[in-house]
Amino acid sequence: GDERASSRDIVLCLDVSGSTLPYDREVIDTYLELVKHFEGERIGLSIFNSTSRTVFPLTDDYELVTKQLTSASKALKGESQDDIDKMSDAEYQDIANWLEGTQNRKDATSLIGDGVVSCAAMLPGFAYGEANHANADRQRAASIVLATDNVVSGKPTYSLTEALDLTQQTKITVDGLYSGPKASESDQTTTDMKSAIESHGGIFLTQSNGASIDELVRDIQSRRDTDVENKAKSSMVDAPGLWTLALAVILIIWIVCAWRLRR
């Protein structure tokens, strides 16, 4: 419906270090399906390793989104070790082209906090290094879907917690999708990510309950849609100005009519 339409901004924030790439393709493929049902939501995609690249900015041009996600999915289709060994030079070049700009710092990979800050900068009202309180009252719900295994190598400018502090101040919700092998779901890095995301009001999901990446992405999407609908309903209840105005107009009309009748 129109009430839900045009009320949400989503940035897909994908860690593209080697260990997470196979999971990135699943996230991308799920959004390729979800975007068919979007009505006014704006979506953007940023990928990061030691540095970030905006694949496409926040937009509701779903033709462009579909084209970009399709080419990303095709580029990543060879992303398992077995497939990499069989890849043609052209396929390898496709992946290299897609990842260009994400590894511009030496001796560092997967700088997750920095990646989140770059993703947040794609949303209105966020400035690097500070939360812009003037724009904290959002017209549209803003959320980041962060897919990573939270394994940092190197020294980031922002830790994940520092990045989440900034997004929280500007009312950007960050939901976390664990993109790594099930065997590592109980690792300290994973439990740290879970506590950081959840303590900042985000949803954190892993595949440990048997759900696929597709199901996890759909779960986050569904929960956030419900949040937006609930906020829209509560804003109608919390903004009695229209009702007060309508009652005042009716009362004035009634007084005028009563006065005329008495004459």
Question: Where would I find each of the regions flagged by the language model?
Answer:
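C-terminal signal-anchor/stop-transfer transmembrane helix together with its immediate cytosolic
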Residues: 1, 226-263
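Sec-exported extracytoplasmic/periplasmic mature domains
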Residues: 32-40, 70-74, 120-128, 168-169, ...
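Residues that scaffold, gate, or flank divalent-cation-dependent active/transport sites
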Residues: 15
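…and closely analogous acidic/polar surface helices at protein-protein or active-site interfaces
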Residues: 3-10, 18-49, 56-70
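Extracytoplasmic/secreted cell-surface and envelope-processing proteins
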Residues: 21-22, 53-57, 152-158, 184-188, ...
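Juxtamembrane amphipathic/hinge helix adjacent to a transmembrane helix
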Residues: 9, 196-238
